[in-house]
Amino acid sequence: MHRVRFAPSPTGFLHIGSARTYIFNWLFARHHGGTMILRIDDTDVGRNSDASETSIFDGLAWLGLDWDEQYRQSERLPLHRAMADAILTKGMAYRDFTPAQAGDSEKSGAQGTWLFNAGMRELSREESDRRAAAGEPFALRFRVPHDREGSVQFTDAVYGEQAKGYGDIEDFALLRSDGMPTYHLANCADDADLRISHIIRGQEHLSNAFKHKLIFDAAGAESPTFAHLPLLMAPDGMKLSKRVHGPVVSVTTYRDAGFLPQAFINFLSLLGWSPKNDREKLSREEMVELFTLEGINRANAVVNFTEEEPFDAKALWLNAEHIRAMPAADLARELLPFVPVDLEKMLQITPLIQERIKLLRDVQSVADFFFVKQLPPYDSAELIPKKGDAAMAKNVLIKACDVLATAEFTHDGLEVALRAASAELGIKAGQMFEPVRVAVCGRKTAPPLFGTLEVLGREACLARIGQAIEKL
């Protein structure tokens, strides 16, 4: 049985690190014919936001990776409290009546300056029950066996054997004084109830796994296999952070720039995982076939970006490769949100630019002249061909007008007509094509000329060439 879960908290936009975690869980589930679970961990009421939750669902929808079961943590509070009660009944937790917020704090233990409150830990069960029955607020803390030799141990599927002494783990909170479960309790209760077999999550949670192993054992639940993923790092050596690195870590940024979902999945999958055959461009089906936890690296993965180029060079290369491999009709549909034309026109344009774009949004700069009636201003010197002058350019364009007025307006017909015209003028074909290209596109670098002329149509081409003649 292979059951895995992705459990985001709706407290911010979908981070590319979170997206990678989802991808690895999804690939693992599909590779083993298992179950993929989406669980929204929304018990931190003060930090949750509808916008964040929308971002998560929008991002996952864009990736196009499905899930089999869906849950919301806040709807499972009775389950969390039942586990807390069971652990308390076994004597493996105690009530902490420390006033104000001190009893809720888990930060002090993380700093290594606090392990437990002796007065609360040693309170008799009778006294604890009496104070609780009287309505005195309390936090519930796990009773870590500090008086025992030994350690919490488990084998991580990525990082290997792990151990932490009992004396190095604080009595962490299970319930806050308002009765709400902490992250540790809610996650363990849900993972146990949902029969999660493997917890695949970021390496930043590795330190939490010791506490979670204690909870699973105390509750009499089977501990899932842990597999912690290497961190995603920025070029500056810092962990990728929403706060520090901004939009570059948001899935939305990649979507809006024009990454294909399959290329983005391919890129993220290679940040910390290596397929056996060392190939880089992979289809979704190939990734499912090849994915194993054994292929995950321990070394942190770097996402390379700069202020000038916000996207990793490998991400851009992979996106371009996936764009080139797509059927032109499918690519045309992907390009539609970025252009002001209908599908019929985009189907004509796409084969001309498919080899020239790295991002879907590049269509706006590579093919902009298809989308306007009037070209933006350009320097008339651009019309002059190599080893030519303005007079040659003008003669070429006048001849082109005559030829295009009657030529068969197809790729092959236009090529035959313009090559014949260059021969008549006694010039090289390139000297004929260059002025025509600039006249109809507004620049020297453009998609293949004859296909471009065909898509623009006779009327637009003649009008643009006529305007170019007036410039000379």
UniProtKB/Swiss-Prot annotation:
It comes from Solibacter usitatus (strain Ellin6076). PANTHER family: GLUTAMATE--TRNA LIGASE, GLUTAMATE--TRNA LIGASE, MITOCHONDRIAL-RELATED. It comes from the Bacteria. GO terms for biological process: glutamyl-tRNA aminoacylation. This is Glutamate--tRNA ligase. Pfam families: Anticodon_2 (PF19269), tRNA-synt_1c (PF00749). CDD domains: GluRS_core. InterPro entries: aa-tRNA-synth_I_cd-bd (IPR045462), aa-tRNA-synth_I_codon-bd_sub2 (IPR020751), aa_tRNA-synth_I_cd-bd_sf (IPR008925), Glu-tRNA-ligase_bac/mito (IPR004527), Glu/Gln-tRNA-synth (IPR000924), Glu/Gln-tRNA-synth_Ib_cat-dom (IPR020058), GluQ/Sye (IPR049940), GluRS_core (IPR033910).
